[in-house]
A protein has these predicted regions:
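Amphipathic alpha-helical packing segments from all-alpha helical-bundle domains
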Residues: 62-65, 69, 95, 114-140, ...
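Hydrophobic alpha-helical connector segments
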Residues: 55, 69-95, 153-156
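Helix-turn-helix
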Residues: 9, 17-51, 55
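Hydrophobic/aromatic-rich alpha-helical bundle segments in the mid-to-C-terminal region
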Residues: 98-105, 120, 138-185
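N-terminal intrinsically disordered/low-complexity leader segments
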Residues: 1-5
Length: 192
């Protein structure tokens, strides 16, 4: 996809339309209409609808892995890194709710087929990053060694991702408060 600012605008519009109508029901014309542009003009920036899906998913997954990597590289204690990971995940969700919704509701095999990068590998890298922080916490003595952290990471990501189903900005609770509550729940469950 060409031109960064326009790319972002197109991806955001595509995410809104696809989240509302579903990937299969969305036509390029629907996205062009949402952008108030001609369908032919949209094709200047994209090749196919699959190109849009690929862009949406890869962007979210790459941001997730990058943010987690930045947290891993800090000198913080593992418990603080976990708190920051929860906050980062929910902030990314909050700022990209439509694209996040597509990632969570569309068929991952379809997503992986359209992706130049392996979407499943990016997801595994993200889980591995969390697991590495928990292992660091076990080694430092901050976290209990009696836990199966592979299962815990899957549970945490399930909890954080399920936020997509119930969280609404208008409900009155800031996403930062949700993050604080979730981080407390997680850390109380794993600390020694």
């Amino acid at each position: 996809m060409k031109h960064t600012a326009k790319k972002k605008e197109i991806l955001q519009a595509a995410a809104r339309v696809i989240r509302t109508k579903g990937y299969h029901a969305t036509r390029i014309q629907d996205i062009a209409d949402a952008l108030q542009m001609q369908k032919g003009s949209l094709y200047y920036y994209i090749s196919t609808k699959e190109d849009l899906l690929k862009g949406l998913v890869e962007d979210i997954l790459e941001q997730s892995v990058e943010l987690l990597g930045n947290i891993q590289d800090t000198k913080h204690k593992p418990s603080e890194k976990i708190r920051l990971c929860v906050e980062s995940h929910l902030r990314l969700f909050h700022n990209n709710i439509d694209a996040f919704g597509i990632l969570l509701t569309e068929d991952m095999h379809l997503i992986n087929k359209t992706s130049e990068k392996d979407a499943f590998k990016l997801l595994r890298d993200y889980e591995t990053g969390w697991l590495n922080i928990f292992n660091e916490g076990v080694k430092s003595g901050e976290f209990s060694s009696a836990n199966d952290y592979k299962i815990i990471v899957k549970g945490i990501l399930g909890m954080l991702n399920w936020t997509y189903r119930w969280y609404h900005v208008k409900a009155g609770m800031p996403i930062e408060e949700v993050s604080r509550i979730f981080a407390g729940l997680i850390l109380n469950g794993v600390k020694k």
